[in-house]
Design a protein with these regions (language model features):
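Conserved N-terminal substructure of TIR/SEFIR domains
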Residues: 1-59, 146-187
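C-terminal interaction surface of TIR/SEFIR-family domains
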Residues: 96-187
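Cross-kingdom TIR/SEFIR domain
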Residues: 23-32, 36, 46-133
Length: 187
């Protein structure tokens, strides 16, 4: 019997809107299956409520912004205590000292994203790879697995595509003539 893919999204207050980016990215994966996306209740969650939502998740996406805020710290600690599979993601252009220390103490390296498009690509690729479980836990058909392969290759190509930022003289530059000028000071 096919299992439901259960995902928990924890986020600091400044990245609350990115939860929706993750939901949309997952909805666009080209296969039909049962996926449950969970989060902490928005108003004064208890430890028990957080524990209940994280306890049997297949993946925890943790989004760290410029500062670590409640209840994100408890979500993080609970996910590790329950030995959940955590993917630490950060968008911290100006991290506070507390956020810097929080990042430093992570048992895994952080994946950086700078905008919603990058976050969606990272999560889509990760979920697609989770769905390709060797035991086919999620009951995908051969045609769906093939679609996932094509989807993963496309996302990998996007990841490897060079930035469109100007480089060299495209972004402005200075040309220096290094040829000797023998007749400059002749009278």
């Amino acid at each position: 019997m096919a299992e439901t893919l259960r995902i928990f999204v924890g986020a600091t207050r400044d990245l609350e809107a990115e939860r929706g980016v993750i939901g949309k990215a997952i909805a666009e994966i080209p296969v039909q299956l049962a996926i449950e996306i969970r989060r902490t209740p928005p108003l004064l969650p208890t430890y028990e409520e957080i524990f209940e939502r994280i306890a049997n998740c297949d993946r925890v996406y943790f989004l760290l912004g410029n500062d670590i805020t409640a209840p994100a710290g408890l979500e993080w600690a609970t996910a590790w205590r329950l030995e959940r599979s955590v993917l630490p993601l950060r968008c911290s252009p100006r991290p506070t000292p507390a956020a810097q220390e929080f990042q430093r103490l992570s048992p895994l390296p952080w994946l950086d994203f700078h905008n919603a498009t990058e976050l969606a690509r990272i999560v889509s690729l990760d979920v697609a790879r989770l769905l390709k479980h060797p035991a086919n836990r999620y009951g995908l058909l051969v045609a769906e697995l093939e679609r996932l392969d094509v989807y993963i290759r496309r996302l990998d190509r996007l990841q490897m595509a060079p930035d469109k930022a100007p480089s060299g003289a495209e972004g402005g530059g200075v040309l220096i003539d290094s040829r000797p000028r023998s007749h400059e000071n002749e009278t």
